[in-house]
Amino acid sequence: MIGLRPEDDRVYDVIVVGAGHAGIEAALAAARMGFRVLVLTVNPDTVGWAPCNPAIGGPAKGVVVREIDALGGEMAKTTDETMINVRMLNVSKGPAVRALRAQIDKISYSRTMKRKLETNPNIVLRHGIVERILTEKGRVKGVVDNYGIDYLGKAVIVTTGTFLRGKIFIGRSTFPAGRMGEFPATKLTESLIELGFEVGRFKTGTPARVLKRSINFSVMERQDTSDEPLAFSFFDEPRVLPKDYPCWLTRTNPETHSIIKQYLEFSPLYGTVKLIEGIGPRYCPSIEDKVVKFKDKESHQVFVEPEGRDTEEYYLNGLSTSLPYEAQIKMIRSVKGLENAIVTRPAYAIEYDYIDPRQLYPTLESKLVENLYFAGQVNGTSGYEEAAGQGIIAGINAALKLRGEPPLILKRSEAYIGVLIDDLVTKGVDEPYRLLTSRAEYRLLLRHDNAHLRLAKYGYRVGLIPKWFYEKVLSLERRINEEIERLKKVIVKPSDRVNDLLTSLRTSPLKEPVSFYQLLKRPQLSYSALKFLDPNPIDDPEVVEQVEINVKYEGYIQKMFEEVAVFEKYENYEIPHDLDYDAVPNLSTEARDKLKKIRPRSIGQAMRIPGINPSDISNLIIYLDRKKQ
């Protein structure tokens, strides 16, 4: 960028509005694919900030982080660099729901992400609050910031998080903010409405922070980092972290709930003067929500989590609230271990604008303005991981379109990111959307352990994954298949030695010869247990893990692949984007209206639109078949 004239410094290939988790992945993807990127943000010192819990991952979300990594994104690597406590969740529940969750040093995470943006030669990170989207003949042209500066770009990606007309609530006190301590974007919503976007209002919240020295950890349950070496990124060597930053578990009690009920009338959500209109997240309710909706529960869990190495603040996971400050102090100090808590930052709720994601294509490009993309919380989602997953897809697709190449659309059967985006653009949102394992029909195929096997080919195709890594994935795939075939051919015959081992492992002895493949199907037996009988076992733990899962769950996996084949039949049945739905006979009025609005790209997507019934689909297929003849 050295030596650029001022006018050149206002012209870019891609402009990213916002530098949160979605904006980071979008900017890095487009820049690494060779395009000049401008990132405009309210505060360049809070890039990739974690305004709520200082953690990355969890059920479904942790798999998304691995998928981002497999596509060539940054979240997994930076989490590995900055995590202070990490655990594998749901180990006893099987591979379909296993996921990593890490406590991050939130200050270090933000600084690391800022450095990665600033050191990329194709990225300029700059302060600016975007107030208007510039368009020309139905195509995006650029943006205007709060200084009145016009920036021109061939593509614009909006990743504004909670900043669109953001408003904070603490009891009956309310003030404009994008998040605590930062200005909101007050004018951009008006520009989006002028362009035809439908805008709604959601709310979320965050708990108070308390000072470490005021916490009595001795009466809480300690939760240390894992003893097993772990890593989010496929590029990083798994490691065991020092046990310097444990999390702690305590609980609310009847006194806590009594205090909450006493102050409900001052709540902006439940009070006599209801100030909050936006709908909050179902799966991350405030403590007052939990007390009101679950009256029979005498206690709720509170996880006391460190915010980082260079701060003494702790996060009270489970005590999100918008009650008045006085009520917060009393409530917190009623909890075991927090009797003398010093609150450093109050809890608050925040209300913000989002756009209806049904106005987007599965590429995350807007249907209303060409080359205008949206990603993250502005699309009605909640969570850092969901935002980052959308961000990398928006960045990749903006770059692919500028290259003149086909877009990247992940299927529901390929990735949790595919499930997330398909749900958004097909069904829309009436509450903040959180990704859950239950939302994925094919979750046994979308595992934590196989994200690179599923998605590295796409990362390599678009230029975000290096050749050596892709070849490593192909080699791994080959070795897995070879080992499965070998196990089918190696026969074990009944003998005293064999049966003694099987009996000691609490499984039935052999009466006739069987293959190692058949033996490994037994739930009591692992690959390592059978090594004593195997003349030529392998030692690669990554291959062993995949072999075990594929052998033990073969029936379920095969059934899912059969379901995917049916699913893809309808996914591959394309619907012309300009189809005149008024010409399709016998559609219900509701179906016709929704098909016009969403304009599904395939019969498969049309089938997932709420309110579209089987007879509507049949009539649509009949009409399309006749048009083809």
Curated annotation (Swiss-Prot):
Subunit structure: Homodimer. Heterotetramer of two MnmE and two MnmG subunits.
Function: NAD-binding protein involved in the addition of a carboxymethylaminomethyl (cmnm) group at the wobble position (U34) of certain tRNAs, forming tRNA-cmnm(5)s(2)U34.
Family: Belongs to the MnmG family.
Domain of life: Bacteria
Keywords: Cytoplasm, FAD, Flavoprotein, NAD, tRNA processing
Cellular location(s): Cytoplasm
Keyword Cytoplasm listed: yes
Protein residues bound to FAD: G18, A19, G20, H21, A22, G23
Residue numbers binding NAD(+): 280-294
Name listed for the protein in its UniProt record: tRNA uridine 5-carboxymethylaminomethyl modification enzyme MnmG
Pfam families xrefs: GIDA, GIDA_C_1st, SAM_GIDA_C
GO biological process terms, semicolon-separated: tRNA methylation; tRNA wobble uridine modification
PROSITE patterns: GIDA_1 (PS01280), GIDA_2 (PS01281)
One MF annotation (Gene Ontology) recorded for this entry: flavin adenine dinucleotide binding
Cofactors named for this entry: FAD
SMART domains: GIDA_assoc_3
Entry's Gene Ontology cellular component terms: cytosol
